[in-house]
């Protein structure tokens, strides 16, 4: 994502040498090296190091009811400027002016500190890393999720978390900067029947074309609609890996793992709602290095997953900025037709990004007897990667209306390859049909859709 910002990135601090710092993150850099490069960029552009840390590795502010309004506005603004870095990480950094230590929002790495009576601050993964006499220690503790502790070496001050956040929140008029932010409820209502629905034989044919079976409906869709959570089985999963299966498999299945490849601690469902967010945004602010060079026409959504009515509302809200790309190709063609279709989709997206249709909507609704859908993961990834290489991605949004989406994994893969929003319209249509058949008891259709 840093590459998408580089096309608009400018600061008076760099003068005429701004192009010399690009790319900010070298190809092949490790996670640590990438974060180091991003922090150095922000610091050298004039931001204080605690501000850079708060911008890149923020605390979980969305679900913190006791947070001061000015601090919340600061984080809201920063979230609209910069994509957050997740961690897990215990950070220690200095630029000669500041010495800062802090944790990411999950705090899955320990960070303890000791302060002595002669002004020595020791911070590390555990107490006892540096031998200190107990009589010298005047304060000890550990940092919590998203917290910082820092020393202003120039002023000789030790600043704790609340002092730092309050100081950063006063660096710019953040509350006025976010005053113009909008939500989906602020958009105009769409025209009636703006989002077509599918039913009967047409729905059945579309479900078959998308590879969805009755078993999928019963085991996956119904569990999500009734309980608002993924289905859990107890008998294991012996389905062959997609890459060696002799059955047709969706592209998302090639990204599925049956084991925990990364050994970071898991996030339980209770902690997840406090430390994670699904918020997404439109109208990326223009320049990540300058607060006064921003666009206040920012739309923030609570989730990238849209219902069909929300999809229609989004299109109506964007008006003539909408560009629609058909992600289908002729049925019965040659294997090379898929590559040609993806090249066409990329070319159309580039033309829209360079023109006035910056809100790109990819859809496979034209699927039918003579048209088959391009795998939407390939289409979305191709558009995102192509626009990034052309320096156009930060000017656009990529909104996907896909028949392939049924489970959370497919939705997550689409967001992971670059989709701004996703509308699983066919799964929603199937849910409506099953509700009409009385399969969800007394539950309202609105509640079933919300659960899903």
Predicted regions and their residues:
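Glycine-rich phosphate/ribose-binding loops and adjacent secondary-structure elements
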Residues: 1-20, 33, 62-90, 96-101, ...
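Conserved short alpha-helical segments that host acidic/polar catalytic motifs at enzyme active sites
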Residues: 2-293, 307
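Non-catalytic terminal/interface segments that mediate subunit docking, oligomerization
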Residues: 227-231, 238-391
């Amino acid at each position: 994502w840093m590459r998408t910002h580089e096309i608009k990135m400018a600061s008076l601090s760099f003068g005429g040498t701004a192009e010399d710092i690009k790319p900010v993150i070298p190809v092949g850099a490790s996670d640590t090296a990438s974060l180091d490069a991003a922090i150095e960029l922000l610091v050298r552009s004039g931001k204080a190091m605690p501000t850079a840390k708060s911008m890149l590795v923020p605390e979980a502010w969305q679900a913190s009811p006791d947070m001061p309004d000015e601090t919340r506005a600061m984080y809201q603004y920063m979230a609209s400027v910069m994509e957050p870095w997740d961690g897990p990480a215990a950070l220690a950094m200095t630029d000669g002016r500041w010495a800062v230590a802090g944790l990411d929002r999950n705090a899955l790495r320990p960070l303890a500190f000791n302060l002595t009576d002669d002004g020595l601050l020791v911070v590390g993964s555990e107490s006892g890393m540096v031998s200190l006499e107990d009589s010298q220690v005047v304060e000890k503790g550990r940092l919590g999720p998203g917290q910082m502790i820092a020393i202003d070496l120039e002023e000789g001050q030790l600043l704790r978390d609340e002092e730092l956040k309050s100081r950063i929140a006063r660096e710019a008029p953040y509350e006025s900067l976010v005053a113009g932010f909008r939500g989906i409820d602020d958009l105009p209502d769409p025209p009636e029947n703006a989002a077509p629905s599918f039913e009967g034989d047409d729905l059945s044919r579309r479900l078959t074309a998308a590879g969805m079976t009755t078993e999928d409906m019963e085991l996956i869709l119904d569990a999500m609609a009734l309980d608002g959570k993924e289905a859990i089985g107890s008998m294991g999963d012996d389905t062959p890996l997609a890459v060696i299966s002799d059955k047709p498999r969706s592209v998302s299945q090639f990204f599925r793992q049956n084991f925990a490849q990364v050994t970071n601690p898991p996030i339980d469902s209770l902690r997840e709602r406090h430390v994670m967010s699904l918020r997404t945004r439109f109208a990326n602010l223009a320049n990540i290095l300058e607060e006064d060079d921003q666009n206040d026409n920012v739309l923030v959504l609570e989730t990238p997953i849209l219902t069909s009515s929300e999809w229609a509302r989004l299109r109506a809200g964007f008006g003539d900025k909408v560009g629609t790309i058909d992600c289908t190709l002729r049925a019965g063609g040659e294997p090379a037709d898929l590559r040609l279709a993806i090249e066409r989709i990329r070319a159309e997206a580039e033309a829209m990004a360079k023109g006035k249709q910056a809100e790109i909507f990819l859809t496979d609704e034209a699927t039918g007897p003579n048209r088959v859908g391009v795998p939407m993961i390939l289409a979305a990834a191709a558009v995102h990667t192509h626009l990034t290489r052309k320096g156009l991605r930060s000017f656009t949004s990529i909104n996907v209306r896909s028949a392939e989406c049924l489970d959370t994994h497919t939705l997550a893969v689409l967001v992971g390859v670059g989709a701004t929003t996703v509308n699983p319209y066919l799964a929603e249509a199937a849910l409506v049909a099953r509700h009409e058949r009385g399969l969800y008891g007394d539950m309202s259709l609105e509640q079933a859709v919300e659960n899903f």
